Amino acid sequence: MDAYEYSELIKELENKIENIESILKPEKLEARLKEIEELENSPDFWNDPKTSAKVQKEKNAILRKLEKYKKAKTALQDNKDMFELASMEEDEETLNEVFNDVQDLKKIIRDLEIEVMLSDENDAKNAIISIHPGAGGTESHDWASILYRMYLRYAERRGWKVEVLDYQAGDEAGIKDVSFLVKGENAYGYLKAENGIHRLVRVSPFDSGGRRHTSFASVQVSPEIDDDIEIEIDPKDIRIDVFRASGAGGQHVNKTESAVRITHIPTGIVVGCQTDRSQHKNKDMAMKMLKSKLYELELEKRKAEEEGKPKDEMGWGHQIRSYVLFPYQQVKDNRSNKAYSRVDDILDGDLDEVIEDVLIAEKEHEN
């Protein structure tokens, strides 16, 4: 990097900080923190645990955003000051240090951009993910299990917790169906980018002829809804089946006659839960999953109407990403239009860059 490239990058980063400031509105956030402080000083505030917990969550989110914003702004100014000083003194060693540091600064500001983007009320929620293999038997069942492992590893990298809700093993390999809850900071905000059809192209390990196969699996992501969100479901619209828990879902899946599957007849949505020995608790969780999916479907519908999208682009039914393992190696996302060659890393859960590129592309599309 030379002085010209540095100054161009600094201009770009300054513009980003200005844009972030206009969206974040730090003064308003500081004012809201003072309001929360006044609320906390009232004894009545703590008498309502539900409300106080909600406000505490809001406070922590504000503090996190302000801290990241201040850190980025200060680091940018410090870097510029150091560059000016090193330039005046013609200190090559310090200049190289400044050029290296500005790359780290780029990453800090990108993280802040993503944080600001995840400001929708649902982004902070936990995420419920369901993976359904497409047609193709063992091939697609195996592909579903590869995706499942990818998300488990991604959650692990981000420090999120995972709770398996429903797991049906494939007859020969892989999985027929899996649903799991991801708990963590902005879990839905990040994972909503995974909603859609995922396509795999590879030489099949199950084909003795070594032929190339294409497999599909759909990933559905819904925010775990709070109890205070009202979703009306007519009992006549659902069918409830009870069965014995099955599959290799790990130690969290029990083996008693308590697994519950609920079918929502008008939409065809099917949800299941088999984590608890209590049929009653599994039914409650399955109903929560159904409500979350109906809520997500309604959000998609409203978004599509606002953007004037045709009906066939709504919901979970469109292809979003291809993973090609043969004849070359590449992951290509249809929304960001970006391609990545580090396929093994991505399938091992290194998804941050891929997801962030999607979030940025979608934000630019909105604007």
Curated annotation (Swiss-Prot):
GO terms for molecular function: translation release factor activity, codon specific. It is found in: Cytoplasm. Keywords: Cytoplasm, Methylation, Protein biosynthesis. InterPro entries: PCRF, Pep_chain_release_fac_I, Pep_chain_release_fac_I_sf, PrfB. SUPFAM superfamilies: Release factor (SSF75620). Methylated by PrmC. Methylation increases the termination efficiency of RF2. The modification N5-methylglutamine is found at Q251. One of its GO terms (cellular component) is cytoplasm. It comes from the Bacteria. The keyword Oxidoreductase does not apply. Belongs to the prokaryotic/mitochondrial release factor family. Peptide chain release factor 2 directs the termination of translation in response to the peptide chain termination codons UGA and UAA. This is Peptide chain release factor 2.
